[in-house]
C-alpha cells in the first residue's frame, strides 16, 4: 500500500462531497473537515495466525476472499507502537512453545499516551508454563498481556490501557478496557472531541447523553453544563465510564445502564425502571441532548425523543442514517454546524457531526 498524499486528498474530498450531498436537502452549512495522519493512525489491530513454511505469521483476510490469507510482516496504518511490538511478539512466540502452542489470534490495543496491551487467543487451556512465559513477555515488552482460552481470561498487568487526550485546554485520562469499543484513530478522536466541546458551548442547564460508552465525550462535555444524565447499555463500558469520571474528578454526571429505547420509556413515564431508583428525572432541566448512536442510527422513537430538546449534538459513523434521522427532525430543527472527521483513511467510511438547533 502506498501512502500518496495526493491520493489521500482526493479520497478525503470524495467523502466531503458525499456528506455535502447527503445533507444538501437540509440546507446544511459547509462542513468543517478534520483530516487524519496518512499512516500510523490506527491504535488497535487484530490478526489471525497462519502457519506457512514451518512457522506462524500474522495474517488477515480480504472481505472478498475469506480463504486466502494475506501474510503481514508490518502494518503501516497501525500505530508505531503496534509496529514495534509485532516483530518482538513474533520472535517471542517462535522462541517459546508455551506461548505459541495453539495460539490462533493476536489483538493489539495502544494509545497516543504510549500504553499497550496484547491479547493472545488460544485453542487450549492456559497452564503454569504459559503464565511463566507470559509474565516474562509482559516485562520484556512493557505491556499488559491478556490470555484468552475457551471463555476464560487470564490478566497479566491490567485489563485496560490508559489514554490521555487534550480537550478545551484540559487533559483527560481515559481507561479503555480490553474488548470494549474505543475510537480507533486517536488523533482524529481528539479533533472530534474538541469540535463537540466547541459546538456545545457553555450552557447554564443540563445535558442528556445517549450511548455514552466509556465516557469518551462525557468527560469534556460535562465541563460545559450544570449536570449530565448519561446512558449506556454495556456493563464493561459503564464500569469504564464510572472509573473515568472518578479519575478525572468529574462529579456532575449521573450514569444509568439503560438503552436509548428504555430511557425514552422512562422520560415518557411509560413504566418505572429499578435502575433509575433514586434518580428524579423531573429535577433535570434539559435543553441539549448528545447522541453517538451505532451505525443503524437512532430508532424512530429515540429520534422523536430528541425533538423535545432545543439543541441536538449528533456524532455519526454512518452518514446515510444521519441523513435519515435529520429528515425526521428537519421540520423542527435546522443544522447550524457540520463537520466531517476522517476516522478511517483509505476506506469509504467516515465519521460526521452536526449541531441541530430548534427553529
UniProtKB/Swiss-Prot annotation:
**The enzyme's E.C. designation:** 2.1.1.-, 2.1.1.35
What stretches pass through the bilayer? none
- Record key words, sorted: Methyltransferase, S-adenosyl-L-methionine, Transferase, tRNA processing
For the protein in the UniProt heading, the enzyme class is transferase
Q: Which molecular-function annotations from GO does this UniProt entry contain?
A: rRNA binding; tRNA (uracil(54)-C5)-methyltransferase activity, S-adenosyl methionine-dependent; tRNA binding
Record-level GO cellular component terms: cytosol
| Active site, UniProt feature | 317 (nucleophile), 351 (proton acceptor)
Q: Pfam families attached here?
A: tRNA_U5-meth_tr (PF05958)
* Superkingdom as given in the UniProt entry: Bacteria
What is catalyzed by this enzyme? uridine(54) in tRNA + S-adenosyl-L-methionine = 5-methyluridine(54) in tRNA + S-adenosyl-L-homocysteine + H(+); uridine(341) in tmRNA + S-adenosyl-L-methionine = 5-methyluridine(341) in tmRNA + S-adenosyl-L-homocysteine + H(+)
**Which GO BP terms, alphabetically?**
tRNA methylation
Binding-site list for S-adenosyl-L-methionine: 183, 211, 216, 232, 292
This chain's function reads: Dual-specificity methyltransferase that catalyzes the formation of 5-methyluridine at position 54 (m5U54) in all tRNAs, and that of position 341 (m5U341) in tmRNA (transfer-mRNA).
Similarity comment:
Belongs to the class I-like SAM-binding methyltransferase superfamily. RNA M5U methyltransferase family. TrmA subfamily.
Instruction: Write down the HAMAP family for this protein, in alphabetical order.
Output: RNA_methyltr_TrmA (MF_01011)
Q: Could you identify this protein by its name?
A: tRNA/tmRNA (uracil-C(5))-methyltransferase
Organism annotation: Pseudomonas fluorescens (strain SBW25)
Amino acid at each position: 500500500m502506498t501512502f500518496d498524499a495526493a491520493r489521500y486528498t482526493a479520497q478525503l474530498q470524495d467523502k466531503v462531497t458525499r456528506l455535502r450531498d447527503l445533507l444538501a436537502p437540509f440546507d446544511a452549512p459547509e462542513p468543517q473537515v478534520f483530516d487524519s495522519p496518512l499512516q500510523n493512525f490506527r491504535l488497535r489491530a487484530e490478526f489471525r495466525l497462519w502457519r506457512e513454511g514451518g512457522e506462524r505469521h500474522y495474517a488477515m483476510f480480504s472481505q472478498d476472499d475469506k480463504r486466502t490469507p494475506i501474510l503481514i510482516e508490518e502494518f503501516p496504518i497501525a500505530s508505531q507502537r503496534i509496529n514495534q511490538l509485532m516483530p518482538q511478539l513474533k520472535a517471542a512466540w517462535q522462541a517459546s512453545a508455551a506461548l505459541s502452542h495453539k495460539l490462533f489470534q493476536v489483538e493489539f490495543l495502544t494509545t497516543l499516551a504510549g500504553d499497550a496491551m496484547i491479547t493472545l487467543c488460544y485453542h487450549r487451556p492456559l497452564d503454569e508454563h504459559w503464565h511463566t512465559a507470559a509474565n516474562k513477555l509482559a516485562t520484556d515488552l512493557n505491556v499488559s498481556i491478556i490470555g484468552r482460552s475457551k471463555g476464560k481470561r487470564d490478566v497479566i498487568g491490567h485489563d485496560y490501557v490508559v489514554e490521555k487526550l487534550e480537550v478545551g485546554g484540559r487533559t483527560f485520562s481515559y481507561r479503555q478496557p480490553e474488548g470494549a469499543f474505543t475510537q480507533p484513530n486517536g488523533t482524529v478522536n481528539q479533533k472530534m472531541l474538541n469540535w463537540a466541546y466547541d459546538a456545545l458551548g457553555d450552557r447554564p442547564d443540563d445535558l442528556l447523553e445517549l450511548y455514552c460508552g466509556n465516557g469518551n465525550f462525557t468527560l469534556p462535555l460535562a465541563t460545559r453544563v450544570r449536570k449530565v444524565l448519561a446512558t449506556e447499555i454495556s456493563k464493561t463500558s459503564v464500569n469504564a465510564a464510572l472509573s473515568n469520571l472518578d479519575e478525572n474528578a468529574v462529579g456532575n454526571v449521573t450514569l444509568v445502564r439503560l438503552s436509548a429505547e428504555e430511557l425514552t420509556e422512562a422520560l415518557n413515564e411509560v413504566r418505572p425502571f429499578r435502575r433509575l431508583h433514586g434518580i428524579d428525572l423531573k429535577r433535570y432541566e434539559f435543553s441539549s441532548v448528545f447522541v453517538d448512536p451505532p451505525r443503524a442510527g437512532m430508532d424512530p422513537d429515540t429520534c422523536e425523543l430528541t425533538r423535545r430538546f432545543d439543541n441536538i449534538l449528533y456524532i455519526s459513523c454512518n452518514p446515510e442514517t444521519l441523513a435519515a434521522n435529520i429528515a425526521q427532525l428537519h421540520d423542527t430543527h435546522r443544522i447550524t454546524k457540520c463537520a466531517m472527521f476522517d476516522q478511517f483513511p483509505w476506506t469509504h467510511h467516515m465519521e460526521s457531526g452536526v449541531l441541530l438547533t430548534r427553529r
